[in-house]
Every structure is written in structure tokens, then in C-alpha cells.
Regions:
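Glycine-rich, acidic/polar active-site loops that bind/position phosphate-bearing ligands
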Residues: 1-208
Length: 208
């Protein structure tokens, strides 16, 4: 069951209730990179959920050749949720990718692969349910610069929490002068942990 809607009819009711202006159809490639197609809400009808949304799959790395580029996105209404960051009210809908040439789910679509794996688990009797627990860990940088030219290649990252900034004179703030050493940023409290408020905002946004 979806968190906000459980059917296509509920989807349109939910969009009307929240004055949704745009529908963002999303899918991922083989390495998990997000891709999307955005439609004006007024251009969407139930037929898009039944027949799908066409797109050019040759634009996705390692997917389709140009002569067989036409593919279909099948929206999953139960996956819909409001985008908390867009200026205009936008609803995000995850999609399955369908191969119109074979008349089946696309073998390079991660959602299709997961669904086939679940079906195999049940049909083989190995299990009836699979649980996935992604570990959401990432770094927050203030600046990332990359150079890849014929005469040089480098990257440079910066963060206020980096110990190389112990003596930096911050123009728009003050320097606490106390920072974790390399690999020393696990479990410290403020002021060493400067991301408390950011994490709290992320959690609250995810729970909405």
C-alpha cells in the first residue's frame, strides 16, 4: 500500500487536494542514477497510468540503440509523494520501464530486476518476503572542484569541519578552532558536530 495514495483515482484526488502543478515521472539507470520526465498536471490522465509515458531510452547510457529507442514508463501510483523542494507543487511518481519491442518489463530497469527477483523467491519457495535495508551514509562538502584537462587532473574538496581549516579566518562567521581529526568524526557532540540541525531537518522532511 502507498503512504499517500493506493490507487490511480486516489492519486488524482490527492493531486487536486494539494493543488499539484507538475508530475515528475522518475526512473533509475543500471547504476542507480535518477532520471525524470516532468509533465504539467493538466496534461496527465488515467491513460498515462494504463498505457505509460513514452521516452527516448537511447539517451540513457548502455540502454537502447537509437533505432530501438522508444520505451515506456509505467507509473506506480502507490509510490507517489510530494516533492518538498520544488518551487511549484510537484508530485513524484516512480516508474517501471517497459520494453515495447519485447512486450515486457525492461531487463535493464532496476525496479524490473527487483520485481523479477521477488517473483523468483516466491515461485521457488526460497522465501515469500525480502527485506532491504539501505545504509544512508554520505559526506557534506562546502565546495567540490574538479579539473580534468590535457595538462592536469585534480580534485579539491572543502568543508568547514575539515581539520585543515583550524586557523582559517571565516568572513561570514567565527572559527571554533576545534575539529575532529581524520576518521574522528563519529559520535562527537556540538560544536564538533556541526550538522545536527541539517540531519534533523532531513529526518523531519523524510517523515512528512
Amino acid at each position: 500500500m502507498g503512504k499517500f495514495v493506493n490507487s490511480v483515482d486516489e492519486f488524482f484526488d490527492y493531486c487536486k487536494e494539494n493543488e499539484v502543478a507538475f508530475v515528475d515521472f522518475r526512473f533509475t539507470d543500471m547504476i542507480g542514477t535518477w532520471h525524470h520526465i516532468t509533465y504539467n498536471m493538466s496534461a496527465i490522465n488515467k491513460g498515462h497510468f494504463e498505457e505509460g509515458v513514452p521516452f527516448d531510452a537511447s539517451s540513457i547510457d548502455a540502454w537502447q540503440p537509437i533505432e530501438k529507442s522508444d520505451m515506456i514508463l509505467k507509473p506506480d501510483a502507490q509510490s507517489a509523494f510530494l516533492d518538498p523542494f520544488t518551487a511549484d507543487s510537484t508530485i513524484i511518481v516512480f516508474c517501471d520501464v517497459y520494453d515495447i519491442y519485447k512486450g515486457q518489463m525492461y531487463e535493464k530497469c532496476p525496479r524490473s530486476i527487483a520485481k523479477k527477483a521477488m517473483e523468483h523467491l516466491k515461485n521457488s519457495g526460497i522465501a515469500d518476503t525480502a527485506y532491504f535495508g539501505p545504509e544512508n551514509e554520505f559526506f557534506v562538502f562546502d565546495s567540490v572542484r574538479i579539473v580534468d584537462n590535457i595538462h592536469c587532473a585534480k580534485y579539491e574538496i572543502d568543508t568547514e569541519e575539515g581539520d585543515w581549516n583550524d586557523d582559517k579566518d571565516f568572513v561570514d562567521g567565527y572559527n571554533t578552532g576545534h575539529r575532529p581529526r581524520t576518521k574522528g568524526g563519529y559520535f562527537p557532540v556540538q560544536p564538533v558536530d556541526s550538522m545536527v540541525d541539517l540531519r534533523a531537518e532531513m529526518v523531519q522532511t523524510l517523515e512528512k
